[in-house]
């Protein structure tokens, strides 16, 4: 009995030690103790970006009810761990529209990434490639199709709005095809621009007008974020 308890104790200690080593390995992947999860990244973005820029990426239309419900829907998705079952290998690979992916999800298109960081699309494309998935470039990304392709050897898709008519769309599709983009995502959910109340409060329209006197009351948002300003100089 003592031998059995001793073996059991050694096994328990070994399991704990193994779990601690595994946890340490995961912890080592965190580059900064100040940025552990998405909420931490959001807070750092809030502190770095001008208010009008942060509210664009963080906000949504009108009372943001749909955005809130979307977040709630994702929070309902949980993992169901299964115990005492054979797991010879874990494989999340899949193929979507002819693109082989190491993970069953992609980096969705985000417009105006360049306003958050000058080479944002290029970095996002490289990050997607490193994770084994595809990056979808937005029509309003702020970087040329050819430049994003030059920045990443990974799979790329292109998200297309048709604001300039058929001729512009066809020319854009031809460029994406020539650059080796593997798929096309046609977006039809924005026939008109959304009423983004945060943008109105921040003076986005006045700032984008390019008229100094009109935008002057809102320029303080950039003055208090000198690091962001320096990125664009």
Regions from the PLM with identified roles:
Residues 50, 107, 128, 186:
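Conserved, mostly hydrophobic/aromatic
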Residues 22-98, 204-233:
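An N-cap/entry alpha-helix motif that binds or orients negatively charged groups
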Residues 145-153:
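Acidic (Asp/Glu)-rich catalytic clusters
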Residues 112, 126, 151, 167-233:
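Alpha/beta enzyme core
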Residues 106-118, 158-166:
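Active-site mouth loops of central-metabolism enzymes
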């Amino acid at each position: 009995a003592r031998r059995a308890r001793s073996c059991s104790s050694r096994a328990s200690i070994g399991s704990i030690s193994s779990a601690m080593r595994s946890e340490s390995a995961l912890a080592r992947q965190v580059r900064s103790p100040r940025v552990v999860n998405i909420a931490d990244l959001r807070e750092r973005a809030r502190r770095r970006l001008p208010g009008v820029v942060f509210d664009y990426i963080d906000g949504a239309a009108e009372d943001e009810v749909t955005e809130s419900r979307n977040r709630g829907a994702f929070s309902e998705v949980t993992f169901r761990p299964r115990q005492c079952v054979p797991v010879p290998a874990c494989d999340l690979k899949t193929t979507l529209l002819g693109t082989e992916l190491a993970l069953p999800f992609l980096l969705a298109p985000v417009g105006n990434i360049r306003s958050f960081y000058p080479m944002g699309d290029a970095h996002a494309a490289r990050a997607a490639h490193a994770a084994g998935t595809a990056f979808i470039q937005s029509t309003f990304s702020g970087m040329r199709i050819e430049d994003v392709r030059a920045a990443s050897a990974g799979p790329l898709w292109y998200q297309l709005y048709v604001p300039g008519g058929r001729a512009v769309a066809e020319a854009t599709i031809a460029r994406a095809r020539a650059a080796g983009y593997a798929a096309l995502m046609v977006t039809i959910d924005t026939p008109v621009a959304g009423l983004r109340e945060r943008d109105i409060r921040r003076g986005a329209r006045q700032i984008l007008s390019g008229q100094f006197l009109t935008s002057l009351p809102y320029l303080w948002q950039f003055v208090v974020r000198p690091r962001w300003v320096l990125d664009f100089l």
